[in-house]
């Protein structure tokens, strides 16, 4: 944190002895939500919710119980939807949804049923609020489209020799295209 008055930075690091602090010092993504608080996705520490005004951390770690926590402690991408809920991309645990009103998680795992994410290693997320769609880039599973209203997934994969498909099944970033 930067202090404009002193010109100094204050570091926040993890401390195993401190239960209220950051769970891991390696932060892979940061999202500032519509309330001005920060959601920090960490490497093997899950998600940390940080209120900078009061310097309070809330930890969301991996859990064996779907409603209580993340499917994986490795969080690489996080986005907020128009309802203030979080969509969390994990490495190895697919896509996680956190409902801020009920404070419960829902996991979207690869291969779990017919309508699922194509791969568990999520590398990119993009939210289209007008269409209520989440675009999900994966490592080796191509591109996924999740219609939030219906819960339906569509998979877009590379097909060898077909130039009309993705050039690769590795999608690391997603940006909107404007005509």
Model-based region annotation:
Residues 1-179:
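Carboxylate-rich, polar loop motifs that coordinate divalent cations or form catalytic acidic clusters
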